[in-house]
């Protein structure tokens, strides 16, 4: 009988942990916050890119490729690096033409159940084909994309199971602390 108890307890414990979609879900059940790591957010982004956006009435296609998310040590903002391609007049937009980097806070959006960029800033742009500098049209395209993306697209989406477990809780704030994204829960 004793031999059966230990395996049953272990199986129950593993099943309970597996039911939590992330380590942050355990915190939601036990505490007042959810925590997410940069690799968790990166995994979500990897499934959502590359993305193509037709701009200027379809004359130009902006392709945003290869997202790389990091949380710089001691920072309250995350960093997103992207490759970018511009397609026009037969040029393939999926061929990287350059790179840009964004710094941003995060906010929770109830409509998408996701973490969205909050007050993103375009930190750097490098387009070697333009001599390393970005012309006004290219910068405008990236800034328009960034505004649309921050408004409409999450960089991470909480799954239905996690949302069910925290349904009785209110999301008070989203911060970046000690290299992690922290969603603070209220009553």
Regions found by a protein language model. Give the residues of each.
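Extracellular/lumenal and peripheral-membrane lipid-interaction modules
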Residues: 20-187
């Amino acid at each position: 009988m004793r031999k059966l108890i230990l395996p049953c307890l272990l199986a129950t414990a593993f099943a309970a942990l597996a039911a939590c979609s992330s380590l942050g879900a355990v915190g939601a059940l036990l505490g007042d916050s959810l925590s997410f790591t940069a690799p968790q957010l990166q995994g979500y982004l990897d499934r959502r890119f590359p993305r193509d956006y037709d701009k200027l009435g379809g004359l130009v296609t902006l392709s945003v490729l290869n997202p790389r998310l990091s949380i710089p040590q001691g920072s309250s903002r995350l960093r997103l690096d992207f490759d970018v391609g511009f397609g026009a007049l037969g040029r393939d937009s999926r061929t990287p033409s350059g790179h840009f980097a964004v710094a941003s806070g995060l906010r929770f959006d109830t409509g998408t159940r996701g973490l969205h960029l909050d007050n993103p800033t375009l930190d750097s742009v490098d387009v070697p084909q333009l001599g390393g500098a970005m012309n006004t049209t290219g910068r405008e395209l990236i800034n328009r994309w960034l505004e649309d993306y921050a408004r409409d697209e999450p960089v991470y989406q909480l799954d239905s199971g996690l949302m069910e477990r925290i349904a009785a809780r209110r999301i008070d704030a989203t911060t970046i602390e000690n290299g992690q994204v922290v969603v603070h829960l209220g009553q």
